[in-house]
UniProtKB/Swiss-Prot annotation:
One example GO MF annotation: GTP binding
Domain of life where this protein originates: Bacteria
Location within or outside the cell: Cell membrane
Gene Ontology BP, a term: positive regulation of translation
Protein's UniProt name: Elongation factor 4
Catalytic activity: GTP + H2O = GDP + phosphate + H(+)
Gene: lepA
Keywords for the protein's UniProt record, in alphabetical order: Cell membrane, GTP-binding, Hydrolase, Membrane, Nucleotide-binding, Protein biosynthesis
Membrane topology: Peripheral membrane protein
Signal peptide start and end residues: none
Amino acid sequence: MDYAEMLDRQKHIRNFSIIAHIDHGKSTLADRILEMTDTIAKRDMQAQVLDDMELERERGITIKLNAVELHYHAKDGETYIFHLIDTPGHVDFSYEVSRSLAACEGALLVVDAAQGVEAQTLANVYLAVDDDLEIVPVINKIDLPSAQPDVVKAEIEEMIGLDASEAVLASAKSGIGIEEILEKLVTDVPAPTGDLEAPLKALIFDSNYDSYRGVVLNIRVVDGTVKVGDKIRLMNSGKEFEVTEVGVMSPKAVKRDFLMVGDVGYITASIKTIQDTRVGDTVTLADNPADAPLDGYRHIQPMVYSGMYPVDNAKFNDLREALEKLQLNDAALEFEPESSQALGFGFRCGFLGLLHMDVVQERLEREFNLDLIMTAPSVDYHVALTDGTEEVIDNPSEMPETSNISEVKEPYVKASIMVPNDYVGAVMELAQRKRGEFVTMDYLDTYRVNVIYNMPLSEIIFDFFDDLKSNTKGYASFDYEVTGYRASDLVKIDILLNGEAVDALSFIVHRDFAFERSRVIVGKLKETIPRQQFEVPIQAAIGNKIIARSTVKAFRKNVLAKCYGGDITRKRKLLEKQKAGKKRMKSVGSVEVPQEAFMSILKMNDEDTKGK
């Protein structure tokens, strides 16, 4: 292809993402667009084509971003090349969204005609506005009996500030308005601006590991071209490799001769060491490098930390390899080795939220065939010590002694909850129970309210989302951003089994809730720890003070079975002998803690602590 043809091709490229709240029809719209552009044969068509991970299809949510190339014959007689990057909608995966948007010039904003603008819609739109993307509003599901397109148009104009008079009315399920959306992409979304003759500059927006080809890099070419045989350099790590294959996803991998400005595709270069690549790095040519790397992405801070241990300690290295491979595909995951007296060797992992943690655990268990134990999640605390130093603690068992602490700060978030009028009371009650501070309340229209609270992150990560959904019959939507750290009266609670603290069961809680939470946890542990041959006391303690206790009764043989009547002293002698044996057993016995015991702490809901 000569220079003029390449320039012409560049004018016909359109890169766009689809952004929306969970369940507003993103993946279905992507399916219809693939169908309309004949990218997928009718016989291969299935719902949510781009959600190719088994877990995504099972849960019906998008977890990973996905990029596909489509060809569209527009009404002006020209053929356009579309690169569609599908994005997740859940708050835990907003990092995936920000990475997708950095590879685009435009975005389709999909809003449900019945539900209107929701919290996550706003959060993702602001990401798109920050990246200066051209936003095309689409009102989806207009064939629903409860659809109110005019109300939703007004909402888009009021809340987002976009002109919605030209918004496309569509139904992804029935295929209404799909052609109009494609025409809008041609006319409204600009072609990529980039210099074909400049040195290669490409942004790595995702990567994954293939056991035959090594690391596969998904890139968006910003300047220049790249072809098989080129020697490339990764600008952050400085490592150099020779390109062995280039291509695009359509939606399966299709090999190409080269990738040029505006293309979204993949390259392989026999990269065997996972540590050499990082999402957000810039690819350039080794013999003609670019002056400066692209901006890349802001480094994302994990919100939630949890210990991850293999059930079989011999699998420690397998877990390390699995985490390294998964990190290629999930840039927000962080981990470092740690050890626990109770669980042996494992890793302290950082996640963006509980759903992210759940998904990582499930992917490790499915894709790498591992059996894992996860400890209760916690956030990171800033602990000021009496000697004037400060420590950041993300593991409750590392909390210093109370006498050495001058204050503990915990992360706070600004939570915005959109909810129908009827449920405002229930939401406010829930937020206050979770130590929330009311900030403001805005009426979006006659029947919906946006309530804003400042809340501690530690109260949100457990089960706030589930409680919110059950208290509002599923109508509330929720988004949060971390605002900073505040001093709180927090205490560390140790759980003792048979008089010994189990480091993996420690947790940090506000002093006001210490007593109730301890009582609930001790009760739950009593149900999950199996009975032993000796009595097992379960205690919760703050420092040396025991604040809750329960006992798992011992199994005992009926030693009096062979005594038919007779002297009481004979019976007493047998009972004393049994008691002494149990005592000796207790002093040397150790208690196995099953995985359910760790999970019971996770699943401690408000019903357990309410009103006690």
